Regions:
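A glycine/threonine-rich phosphate-anchoring loop and its flanking beta-alpha core
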Residues: 115-208
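C-terminal charged capping/lid subdomain of soluble metabolic enzymes
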Residues: 6, 185-187, 287-364
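Active-site segments that bind and position negatively charged phosphate/pyrophosphate groups
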Residues: 205-315
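Residue-level signal for inorganic ion chemistry
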Residues: 16, 41, 79, 130, ...
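Glycine-rich beta-strand-to-loop/alpha-helix junction loops that act as flexible
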Residues: 73-74, 104-106, 236, 248-249
Length: 364
């Protein structure tokens, strides 16, 4: 299955169980990588033992010179310090602007590889080879790259489109249950914002997706990518407000991740909690139907994303939200679902947020 991402520099997303085997041959057909003298594969300590040799063998079979960097797995790796180590390693390998970086891993590896590639020598080509469901449906497509600071997630980064995306569904067979549910959270987010058709298809197939049905999984990945590609095509750098819809659930979700400690809850679980909060906020201030709230709750439950039992002080949550990238002049903005397939970005006053955060905390 191939999804074409349109734009000034269009690229393909190839989805299938055998696409990693053909990585080298595919890259020889991509203009940006066809004549690259060297490919650097960036992976992590979870993924490298499983798939690094296969990726390298495919690249070498296509007559690429191949180098590798393996970083520790986990969100803490997505840091300026690790990025600096990668830049130094790139310099040591004498990578030129005609070389390319392949990101073989989940979202952390994809973000880190995209960021370091886009900034080293003012930009070298990056190829995404996501191995997690979350990375396939979210971070590998759209061009956002970045690293975290102590003040918050993804505060330093670039917009850099990949030259190619290789989504090997074979790699999902080794994905832990927690990470599977994490990807399901982003798929659910996309369905709520996209359309009735996507949402009700996902609702009908939620149990099959949760149990990793191969055909349903491939279809869910493709639908999510098509949705995101359409949004990104309208607003590549978040300058027109259209792309803000992709942050549905993330305002509270990022605060949960930050205050609970990165890694305590998966990104998808935190986003799902943010979706529940935003839908209830929408019902209170934007006319969102309670039927939408319930339908979303049911979908998240069926996908293995129950409401979290964790909470934090409303004032602490609000302080983190004010550092959210959507905030302007200290005013927090939420993506609110007006209905399935309809949304708005709304500024919400502090006292309203605190009131609803207090109710959220009491429910735990």
């Amino acid at each position: 299955m191939i999804v074409n991402i349109p734009g000034e520099r269009p690229y393909d997303v190839r989805i299938g169980s055998d696409v990693l085997d053909g990585l080298g041959n595919y890259l020889r057909r991509v203009d940006a990588t066809a004549n690259a003298p060297r490919i650097l594969v960036l992976s992590d300590t979870n993924v490298a033992p499983l798939y690094l040799e296969e990726a390298k063998a495919s690249l070498r079979a296509a007559d690429y010179r191949v180098s590798e960097i393996v970083v520790p797995a986990g969100e803490k790796t997505k840091s300026v310090e690790v990025a600096g180590e990668i830049w130094e390693a790139m310099a040591g390998l004498k990578l030129g602007r005609d070389c390319a970086v392949v990101a073989l891993g989940g979202g952390v590896v994809g973000d880190l590889a995209g960021f370091t590639a886009s900034t080293f020598m003012r930009g070298i080509t990056v190829v995404q080879a996501p191995t997690s469901l979350l990375a396939m449906v979210d971070s590998s497509v759209g061009g956002k790259t970045g690293v975290n600071l102590s003040a918050g997630k993804n505060l330093v980064g670039t917009f850099t489109q990949p030259a190619y995306v290789c989504a090997s569904t074979k790699t999902l067979s080794t994905l832990p249950s927690r990470e599977w549910a994490c990807g399901c959270g982003e798929i659910a987010k996309s369905s709520v914002i996209d359309s009735d058709e996507f949402f009700f298809w996902l609702s009908d197939n939620a149990s099959a997706l949760a149990s990793r049905d191969r055909d349903v999984t491939a279809e869910a990945i493709a639908r999510s990518i098509v949705f995101k590609a359409d949004v990104v095509a309208q607003d590549k750098t978040e300058s027109r407000g259209v792309r803000e819809c992709l942050n549905y659930g993330h305002t509270l979700g990022h605060a949960v991740e930050s205050l609970a400690g990165y890694g305590t809850y998966s990104h998808g679980a935190a986003v799902a909690e943010g979706m529940r909060f935003a839908a209830r906020l929408g019902a209170a201030i934007a006319g969102t139907s309670i039927d939408v709230v319930r339908a979303q709750d049911n979908l998240l439950d069926e996908l293995g994303l129950p409401a979290l039992s964790w909470s934090a002080a409303p004032e602490d949550m609000l302080a983190v939200m004010k550092r959210d990238k959507k905030a302007r002049g200290g005013v927090v903005k939420f993506v609110l679902p007006l209905d399935i397939g309809q949304w708005e970005l709304r500024e919400v006053e502090d006292d309203v947020i605190l009131e609803h955060l207090a109710a959220w905390a009491r429910s735990k």
